[in-house]
Amino acid sequence: MASTAREIMTGGVECIGEDETVLDAAKKMAELGVGALPICGNDERLKGMLTDRDIVVKVLAAGGDAATTTAGSLGQGEVVTIGADDSIDELCRTMSKHEVKRLPVIDNQKLVGVVSESDLAAHATPEQVVKVVRGVYGDD
């Protein structure tokens, strides 16, 4: 059974540049069949995560223009990450504590992958999955 984030993550993750538009991000999400993209700066460092929900709620529903709004303008605050060699238990604690559905995986200060709920469901114990679901979505 897998024991580290590196073992269950989806690798080869593509970033959206912080200066690229939200429209570009939406097209890339559709092309890749994903619901979120890491936002990377010109220095290749992780700046945030952009989700399809961010695009709908923070741009479209707010009357913004997806063709002019940059991905970087939506990736605010501190990015929650996990180390590639951190345990699945630590990964579950981090997802629960920060109520996140996707967790970027960092190795030597570089993005190497992302762990999603589906990665977790495929590789974690049922107890670990329940812990994350309760942390992210509540006990109700």
Regions found by a protein language model. Name each.
Residues S118, A122-T125:
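C-terminal structural segments of small proteins and small subunits
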Residues D24, D54-I55:
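Non-catalytic alpha-helical scaffold/packing segments enriched in small hydrophobic residues
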